[in-house]
Amino acid sequence: MIKVVPKVLVMSGYGINCETETAHTFQKAGAKTDIVHINDLIAGKKKMADYEIIMFPGGFSYGDDTGSGNAFANKIKNNLFDDLKEFINSGKLILGICNGFQVMTNLGLFALPSTDYGERISALEANTNNRYECRWVHIKENESICVFTKGIDIIHVPIAHGEGRFYCDEKTYLELKENKQIVFTYCDSEGNPANKEYPLNPNGAYYDIAGICDKSGRIMGLMPHPERSLYSISEPEYQLKKEIAKRNGEIIPEFIESNIQIFKNAVEYFNK
């Protein structure tokens, strides 16, 4: 059987700044990528329908003015939302990381069984310590319906955000939980819940939530950056781990497999 190589539209423009490493990670996972400025979509030079995956990367779109991800989301709402809904209804995939998650939250892409796309169900607010957090954390997959996280348990990933505190009301939380839409939660290295305690939970996120998906499992957003932790050499204490492995006659793998697996799962979705 001929393997399908999905095309990824990596969104760019107005302060998004993680498009290069995000495109690189998808390429290593087996996809083709185009970095596309949002204005080229609005002008019709590029079309969402020509792609299988839309990627909203991290960054600081519009400098986080009017709130993180808000202005970029409004640009999409006012110019591209019909195209985006058509893309969703065609059964394709959407992923958002950090600022991309914030944009998608403002767009209302994380529909519940009781809501439709375009209805906002949650928020990503300022970290409780009012500080920009830039370090590594552990997150655990919650046996969700998300297609991006098949075979993933605990992963070690960097964060870089000042507004990452997930919030929703109790009714929404219960529906997310019931429908297995809570994808990642903050934890310790053994997978024990952070219980909203700092520094395991870096931003005070309600219920330790680091990432969620929509009711179909095809649309995911998360605050941590797996695309920035593709290679083992990027991990903290890499040199120490390398030396220990050397003394044991072992070799550290090139990739952090659990992190690239998110992107491989997206590619494999089109080869079922």
From Swiss-Prot:
PROSITE patterns: GATASE_TYPE_1. InterPro entries: Class_I_gatase-like (IPR029062), PRibForGlyAmidine_synth_PurQ (IPR010075). The active site is at residues 98, 225, 227, 235. Signal peptide: none annotated. GO terms for biological process: 'de novo' IMP biosynthetic process. Its main location: cytoplasm. Residues 8-243 form the Glutamine amidotransferase type-1 domain. It catalyses: N(2)-formyl-N(1)-(5-phospho-beta-D-ribosyl)glycinamide + L-glutamine + ATP + H2O = 2-formamido-N(1)-(5-O-phospho-beta-D-ribosyl)acetamidine + L-glutamate + ADP + phosphate + H(+); L-glutamine + H2O = L-glutamate + NH4(+). It is found in: Cytoplasm. Pfam families: GATase_5. One of its GO terms (cellular component) is cytoplasm. NCBIfam families: FGAM_synth_I. Part of the FGAM synthase complex composed of 1 PurL, 1 PurQ and 2 PurS subunits. Part of the phosphoribosylformylglycinamidine synthase complex involved in the purines biosynthetic pathway. Catalyzes the ATP-dependent conversion of formylglycinamide ribonucleotide (FGAR) and glutamine to yield formylglycinamidine ribonucleotide (FGAM) and glutamate. The FGAM synthase complex is composed of three subunits. PurQ produces an ammonia molecule by converting glutamine to glutamate. PurL transfers the ammonia molecule to FGAR to form FGAM in an ATP-dependent manner. This is Phosphoribosylformylglycinamidine synthase subunit PurQ. It comes from Methanococcus maripaludis (strain C7 / ATCC BAA-1331).
